C-alpha cells in the first residue's frame, strides 16, 4: 500500500478523526484511558520516589519513626496504585475486545448504505478485505489509533513526571570545582545531557519508524493471502478431510506465507531495531550514571536521590524515544486510516431523488424502459442495448434467454440496484431517479435465485424485521407450501435456521430454503413481485405445486418471472426474450412459439428436444 506524503497537520486531522470514530464506537473509552494513564504512570515512579526518601533518611538522621511511616506509605501506596491500575487496565482490555466486534458492526452498517454497484465492485471488496486483514494481523487502522494514542498519553505523563522529579538534578552546587567536576557543576553539562538525550531519542525514533514501516508493509501484503488460506480451511474443510488435501494445503501455505523474502524482511527489521535500541540504551545508561554520580559526589544531590535520578532519567529517555516512535508509527498508520475513511465515506448517489412515490388506491403503476443501455462500472462491454418495453400492474411478465443475455441485469435496473448508462426507466411517466430511493425500492418484492437466508428465526427471515406479524408469516409460509413443515417444528416459526446461534436450529433443504425466500417476497406485499428462477432448487413435485399456486401467489400484483424452463412461462401474459443484451421478442407464448424464425421458437424446440430424448 502506498504511503502518501502528508503534512503534520494533515496527519493530525486524520488521527483526530479516527479518535472521533473510536469515541462513537466505544463512548466509555476516554475516561478509563485517562484514569489508566495516570495510575500506570504513577505506579513505577511512586516506589522510586519513596525509595529515595527512605535512603536519604537512612544516611541522614535515621529517624526510626519517620522511616516506619515512609515504609508504610511506600507499601500501602504501591498496593493501592496497583489495584487502581489493574482495575482501569481491566476495563480498557474489555473495551478493546468489545471494540473489534463493534468495529465490524460499524463497517457492516456503513456497507448497508452503499450503492449496490459498490457491493459488487471487486475493488471495494478488496478494500474491505484489506481493512479486516490488516486489522487482524497488525491492528493497523482504527484499532492502532487508540492503542498508540493511549501510549502517547502515558509517555507524555511519564515525561512530565520525570521532569518534575529531576529538576533539582540541574541545580548548581555552591563552591568552586575544577576539571571534570567543575564542568558537571556548570549549566553546560545540563545542555550536553539534554543534547545526548535528544540525539538518543531522535535515533531511536528513526530506527523504530523504519522498522515498523517495513514490518507493517510486509504484514499488510501477507494479510489477505493469510485470510484467504485460512478461509479455505473453514469453507473446504470437508473436502480437505475426504480427499486428504492437508499436505497440498500445507505446501501452499509455506510457499505463500513463508517466502524467504518476507521472513528476511521481518527478521532484518526486528533485529536492526533491537540491536540499535540496545546499544543506545547502554550508551545512555553510562552517560546518566556518570552525570548523576558526579552530581552526588559534589553534593548537589543525596545518595537516595542518586537512585531516584538513575531510574527517572532512564524512564524519561525511554519515554521520549518511545513517544517519538509512537508518533512516527501513528503517522505511518494513517495510510490504513485513509483507506478505512474512504470505505466508510463511499458516496451513494442513489438518494438524490426527492419525489414521493404516489400512493394509489387502484395500485395503477406502469413501468417503461425507454431506449435503455447499460454496461457495468469499470467495463466497456454493453450488457443491455437499446431496450424498450412497457408493462402495467397486474401483468405477468416472463424474462427468458440464454445465459449472459442480460436477463438478471434487466431486473437489477428495474429494481434500481444500478442506473442505466443510457436511456431512462419511467414510473408512471416520471424518471425513477427523481423518486425517493427508499420509496421506489418499496414497490418491489424480490426473490433472487442467489437469495440469502440468515441464521435467525424463520419468522425473522420471512418478515425481514424484528417487528413480526406472526399470523402473516404463517399465511405466507402456507401459500408457498411450507406451512405444515414449519408448524410441526417444536418452536414453529421461531425455529432458527441452522445452528450458528441456537443448538436446536434446523437445517433446511435447498428447496425448503427457496420456499422461505419466496415467503419473504410475499410478506413484503409490494405491488411488483420479481421471481428469479423461483423453482430452481425444487424437485419436480414441489415445482408443480408452486406453479399451481402461482396465481394465488402473484394475485393482483405485477409479477416479473425469470426462468430457464420455458414450459413454466406459459401462464404469463407476456414473454420478453433477450439475446446478447437486446430485447429481440415480446409477446405471449402462443404468439412467440409460432414465429418460426424467432429466438423463442429456437429455445422452445431445444428444450422440447431435450425432454423428448430423455423420455425416449
Q: What positions do the PLM features span?
A:
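Helix-to-loop junction immediately C-terminal to a conserved catalytic motif
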Residues: 415
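A hydrophobic transmembrane-helix motif
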Residues: 43-53, 149-183, 188-209, 262-310, ...
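ABC ATPase nucleotide-binding domain helical subdomain, centered on the C-loop/LSGGQ "ABC signature"
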Residues: 424-426, 441, 459-503, 547-548, ...
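Extended non-transmembrane interhelical loops and adjacent amphipathic helices
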Residues: 1-16, 97-143, 221-264, 334-347, ...
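ABC-fold ATPase nucleotide-binding domain signature/coupling loops
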Residues: 382, 420, 426, 483-516, ...
Amino acid at each position: 500500500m502506498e504511503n502518501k506524503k502528508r503534512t503534520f497537520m494533515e496527519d493530525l486531522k486524520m488521527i483526530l478523526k479516527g479518535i472521533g470514530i473510536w469515541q462513537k464506537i466505544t463512548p466509555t473509552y476516554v475516561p478509563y484511558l485517562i484514569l489508566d494513564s495516570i495510575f500506570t504512570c504513577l505506579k513505577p515512579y511512586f516506589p522510586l520516589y519513596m525509595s529515595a526518601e527512605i535512603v536519604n533518611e537512612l544516611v541522614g538522621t535515621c529517624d526510626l519513626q519517620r522511616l516506619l511511616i515512609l515504609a508504610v506509605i511506600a507499601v500501602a501506596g504501591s498496593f493501592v496504585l496497583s489495584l487502581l491500575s489493574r482495575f482501569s487496565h481491566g476495563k480498557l482490555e474489555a473495551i478493546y475486545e468489545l471494540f473489534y466486534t463493534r468495529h465490524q458492526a460499524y463497517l457492516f452498517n456503513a456497507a448497508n448504505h452503499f450503492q449496490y454497484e459498490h457491493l459488487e465492485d471487486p475493488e471495494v471488496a478488496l478494500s474491505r478485505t484489506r481493512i479486516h486483514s490488516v486489522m487482524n494481523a497488525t491492528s493497523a487502522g482504527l484499532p492502532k489509533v487508540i492503542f498508540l494514542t493511549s501510549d502517547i498519553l502515558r509517555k507524555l505523563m511519564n515525561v512530565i513526571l520525570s521532569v518534575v522529579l529531576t529538576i533539582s538534578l540541574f541545580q548548581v552546587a555552591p563552591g568552586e570545582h575544577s576539571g571534570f567536576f567543575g564542568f558537571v557543576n556548570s549549566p553546560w553539562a545540563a545542555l550536553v545531557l539534554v543534547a545526548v538525550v535528544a540525539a538518543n531519542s531522535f535515533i531511536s525514533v528513526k530506527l523504530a519508524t523504519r522498522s515498523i514501516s517495513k514490518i507493517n508493509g510486509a504484514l499488510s501484503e501477507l494479510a489477505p493471502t493469510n485470510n484467504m488460506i485460512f478461509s479455505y480451511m473453514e469453507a473446504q474443510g470437508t473436502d480437505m478431510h475426504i480427499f486428504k488435501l492437508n499436505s497440498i494445503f500445507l505446501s501452499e501455505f509455506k510457499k505463500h506465507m513463508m517466502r524467504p523474502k518476507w521472513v528476511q524482511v521481518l527478521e532484518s527489521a526486528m533485529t536492526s531495531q533491537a540491536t540499535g535500541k540496545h546499544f543506545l540504551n547502554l550508551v545512555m545508561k553510562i552517560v546518566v550514571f556518570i552525570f548523576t554520580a558526579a552530581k552526588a559526589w559534589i553534593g548537589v544531590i543525596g545518595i537516595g536521590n542518586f537512585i531516584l535520578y538513575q531510574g527517572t532519567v532512564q524512564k524519561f529517555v525511554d519515554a521520549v524515544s518511545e513517544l517519538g516512535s509512537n508518533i512516527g508509527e501513528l503517522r505511518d498508520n494513517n495510510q490504513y486510516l485513509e483507506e478505512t475513511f474512504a470505505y466508510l465515506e463511499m458516496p451513494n448517489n442513489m438518494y438524490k431523488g426527492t419525489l414521493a412515490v404516489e400512493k394509489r388506491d387502484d395500485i395503477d403503476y406502469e413501468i417503461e424502459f425507454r431506449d435503455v443501455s447499460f454496461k457495468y462500472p469499470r467495463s466497456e462491454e454493453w450488457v443491455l442495448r437499446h431496450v424498450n418495453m412497457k408493462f402495467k400492474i397486474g401483468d405477468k411478465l416472463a424474462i427468458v434467454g440464454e445465459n449472459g443475455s442480460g436477463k438478471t441485469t434487466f431486473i437489477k435496473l428495474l429494481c434500481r440496484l444500478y442506473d442505466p448508462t443510457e436511456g431512462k426507466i419511467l414510473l408512471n411517466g416520471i424518471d425513477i431517479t427523481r423518486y425517493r430511493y427508499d420509496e421506489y425500492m418499496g414497490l418491489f418484492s424480490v426473490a433472487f435465485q442467489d437469495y440469502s437466508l440468515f441464521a435467525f428465526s424463520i419468522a425473522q427471515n420471512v418478515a425481514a424485521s424484528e417487528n413480526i406479524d406472526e399470523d402473516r408469516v404463517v399465511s405466507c409460509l402456507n401459500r408457498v407450501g411450507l406451512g405444515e413443515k414449519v408448524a410441526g417444528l417444536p418452536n414453529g416459526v421461531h425455529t432458527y435456521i441452522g445452528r450458528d446461534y441456537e443448538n436446536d436450529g434446523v437445517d433446511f433443504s435447498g428447496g425448503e430454503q427457496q420456499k422461505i425466500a419466496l415467503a419473504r417476497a410475499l410478506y413484503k406485499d409490494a405491488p411488483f413481485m420479481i421471481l428469479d428462477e423461483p423453482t430452481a432448487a425444487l424437485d419436480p413435485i414441489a415445482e408443480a405445486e408452486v406453479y399451481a399456486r402461482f396465481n394465488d401467489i402473484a394475485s393482483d400484483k405485477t409479477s416479473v418471472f425469470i426462468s430457464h424452463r420455458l414450459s413454466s412461462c406459459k401462464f404469463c401474459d407476456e414473454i420478453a426474450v433477450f439475446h446478447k443484451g437486446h430485447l429481440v421478442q415480446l409477446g405471449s407464448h402462443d404468439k412467440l412459439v409460432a414465429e418460426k424464425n424467432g429466438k423463442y421458437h429456437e429455445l422452445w424446440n431445444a428444450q422440447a428436444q431435450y425432454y423428448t430424448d430423455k423420455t425416449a
